[in-house]
Design a protein with these regions (language model features):
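Face-selective signature of the C-terminal outer-membrane beta-barrel domain
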Residues: 156-167, 197-342
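Short linear interaction motifs
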Residues: 68-73, 187-192, 253-256, 268-272
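N-terminal periplasmic accessory domains that precede
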Residues: 1-4, 18
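Transmembrane beta-barrel wall of Gram-negative outer-membrane proteins
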Residues: 44-178, 201-208
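Flexible, surface-exposed loop regions and adjacent strand-edge segments
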Residues: 17-23, 117-128, 169, 178-189, ...
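Outer-membrane beta-barrel domain signature
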Residues: 75-78, 138-140, 189, 193-197, ...
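Sequence/structural signature of outer-membrane beta-barrel proteins
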Residues: 8, 112-114, 171-173, 230-232, ...
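Flexible glycine-rich, low-complexity coil/linker segments exposed to the extracellular/periplasmic environment
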Residues: 9-79, 248-255, 301-342
């Protein structure tokens, strides 16, 4: 068993951006806070675009109110904790009536934080001159949780060996980010974008293989079968935008909000068999006859949905100046104020 603790001078113990998320985020798994709400999930699965043409105002209101508010939208500042991790490993071998049985297992957990500040610019050529289009100050705080497991099982004797290996890797990234600066493409006004994100990348692979010898080793048969699945899940990938009023205070640009749900799954199945027969021709020569067959099948599915709250009527100054979770509270999600659309 191994355990580790660490930190760095820029992140650990200093106040940086965070958002709450769910109570179990530190494990790399959330507590279903980020599950797609029922009515929205049904619309996604049925291929119905979420808009006023396909759903009533009451249904759109229910969908909008079903989206998680403050825990996934409100940026705050807290002291960043230390990094930590541990690793467990073990194994054994044991002689049985069928042969030698071996087992090995390794599991690990790592939790790290990385805070960054910098500048992000986009430019374009005007003639021979490169001029900035946007120039943003960027502040980010990223929490990465990595989980891994490796397990192996084998059984072998003089003529036969079978091995089964499983690998699971999960990498979860939780990031709170804010960018602010002039957007010269939109008149040079100050724009601020706040982001809350949660990305889950997973890999699972299982492989079983065998090697067998018959006829005093003259006939050898090797076989293998494998399954691998990779996935990327990004629920509630959110952006909320602000402009600046005459007094220099940030106010909501409600048309700049975006809440995205995306998934990607990649499945691979493969297998094969090889056989070889050795025919002695003399003490110095032999002939080897071999044959083999293999197959591979791959399937990929990807899906993405972008949701946005649109202002049905002009927002009041009080609404535009309110906190993010107040503006998108149930009180303001109704047929006359904010309405959800895809």
């Amino acid at each position: 068993m191994k355990a580790s603790i660490g930190g760095n001078t820029e992140s650990t113990g200093k106040e940086h951006l965070i958002y709450f998320g769910s109570r179990t985020d530190f494990t790399g798994f959330d507590d279903d806070t980020r599950e797609v709400p029922g009515l929205i999930d049904i619309a996604f699965k049925n291929g119905q675009q979420i808009n006023s043409a396909n759903f009533s105002a009451t249904e759109l209101q229910q969908m909008g109110r079903a989206l998680v508010n403050a825990p996934l939208r409100l940026l705050q500042r807290e002291k960043t904790p230390v990094d930590g991790g541990f690793e467990l490993s073990g194994g054994f071998s044991h002689d049985t009536g069928l042969g030698s049985l071996g087992v090995i297992a390794v599991a690990g957990y790592d939790n790290s934080w990385r805070a960054r500040e910098g500048f992000q610019e986009e430019g374009q050529f005007q003639g021979d001159e490169l001029v900035p289009v946007t120039s943003y100050a960027v502040e980010s705080n990223q929490n990465d949780v990595r989980l891994n497991f490796l397990g192996g099982l084998s059984l072998s004797n003089d003529d036969h060996e079978v091995k089964w290996t499983n690998l699971y890797v999960r990498n979860t990234t939780k990031e709170a980010r804010s960018t602010a600066g002039p957007d010269f493409d939109a008149g040079g006004g100050i724009i601020r974008n706040d982001y809350t994100e949660w990305f889950v990348r997973q890999l699972f692979t299982s492989q079983i293989a065998g090697e067998h010898h018959f006829m005093d080793g003259a006939l050898e048969i090797d076989w293998r079968a494998a399954y691998a699945k990779t996935s990327r899940d990004a629920p509630y990938e959110s952006r909320f935008q602000y402009g600046v009023d005459a007094d220099g205070n940030y106010i909501h640009n409600v048309q700049g909000n975006l809440i995205s749900f995306s998934e990607l799954d990649d499945d691979n199945v493969s297998g094969g068999v090889d056989a070889a027969y050795t025919l002695p021709l003399s003490n110095a020569r032999e002939a080897i006859f071999s044959v083999g067959v293999s197959s591979f099948d791959s399937n990929r599915d990807a899906e993405r949905h972008d949701l946005q709250f649109e202002a049905v009527n002009a927002l009041t100054e009080e609404q535009r100046q309110s906190r993010i979770d107040y503006l998108f509270s149930d009180y303001n999600i109704n047929p006359s104020t904010l309405q959800l659309r895809e």
